[in-house]
């Protein structure tokens, strides 16, 4: 969380991979076709769809990913020039076991 005196905006977000762009594009349709499926099951179904699509379809998402990556790199350069390198965010590990 940002404090009030922290005037530095958040750095640009990393671009999504080609698969995640595909997932984003297909999620609602797969969910509509499988309304009772869990999120993990939906993701597996989308992964199967991804494996089944042709190279031409994958190329479309890879191109979108490349464009997003180029924009991210440009935005990141501008951010670093203005604010310096962003601090590394510490990953918060979620403890799956309940603590006693």
UniProtKB/Swiss-Prot annotation:
Localization, UniProt: Nucleus; Chromosome
Chief location category: nucleus
Record's keyword terms, sorted: Chromosome, DNA-binding, Nucleus
SMART domains named among the record's database cross-references: HMG
GO CC terms, sorted: chromosome; nucleus
Pfam families, per the entry: HMG_box
Ranges annotated as biased composition (Basic residues): 90-100
DNA-binding region ranges: 12-80
Start and end residues of each stretch annotated as Disordered: 81-100
GO MF term list: DNA binding
SUPFAM superfamilies (alphabetical): HMG-box (SSF47095)
InterPro entries, sorted: HMG_box_dom, HMG_box_dom_sf, HMGB
Domain of life: Eukaryota
Protein's name according to its UniProt entry: High mobility group protein C
Organism field: Tetrahymena thermophila
């Amino acid at each position: 969380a940002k404090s009030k005196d922290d005037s530095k905006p958040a750095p640009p977000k990393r671009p999504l991979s080609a698969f995640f762009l595909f997932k984003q594009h297909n999620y609602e349709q797969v969910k509509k076709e499988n309304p009772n499926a869990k999120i993990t099951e939906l993701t597996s179904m989308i992964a199967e769809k991804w494996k089944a699509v042709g190279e031409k379809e994958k190329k479309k998402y890879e191109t979108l990913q490349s464009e997003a990556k180029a924009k991210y790199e440009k935005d990141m350069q501008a951010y670093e020039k203005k604010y310096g390198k962003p601090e590394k965010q510490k990953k918060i590990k979620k403890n799956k076991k309940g603590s006693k």
